Amino acid sequence: MVSKTFILMAAIAYVEARFGQEQVPIAAIQAVQGGNPGEAATIAGAAISDLLGAASSCAKLTRADEIFTKLGGGADALAAAIGMVTAEKNTNPSANGNAQNVCGDASLPATPELRGITPLIDPAVDVDGKAAALSQSSATTPLQADGMSVFDLMSANGLGDLANAGASKGNNASNNNAAAGNNNAAGNDNAAA
C-alpha cells in the first residue's frame, strides 16, 4: 500500500513539475510595467490558455504580439513576449502520439522583434535537445524569417519531423509542408484528399 501511494505521489509531482515549466512566461508578463493599470495581469491570465495543448498553436504568437504592443513595447514587454514565443505548449503524452503543434502561419508573429524565434517542445519528443538549442539561440539571435512560419523555421533547421504545422483560427495552413518532403500533414488522417 505504501509503495502505491509513493508511486502516485511521484506521478503527481512529475505532472505538476512539467506543467510548471510550460507556465514560465506568465510571471514575466505580470511583471511588465507598461500598458494600462491591470492590463499586464489580464493578459497574463489569458495567456495561460494559449499554452494548453488543445489551444491553437498560433494563439500564443498572437498573444506575444499583444504583450509587446499593449504593454508599451519596452524591454520588459519584449522579454515577456519572447518568453511567450519560446514557451513550451502543454501536451498530453498519451494523446495523439504527443504531437507537438507549431504555428504554420507565416504572418505570425507580426511584431518584427519576435519573428525568427522558435519554441521549446516537449523534451520527451526533443530527445536530443536540438529544438531546445534552436529555441535558445533564436531567442537571442533570431533566424531570418521573411515569408516563413515558425514551423517553416523549424523544418528548415532539420526539426520538421518533430512537429506538426498548426493553423491559426480560420487559416488552412496550406504551406506545402507535405509537398516539401514533410509528411506531417500527409501522413495523418487529417490530410485533405
Predicted regions span which residues?
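Fungal secretory targeting signals
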Residues: 1-21
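Mature extracellular/secreted ectodomains of secretory-pathway proteins
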Residues: 21-193
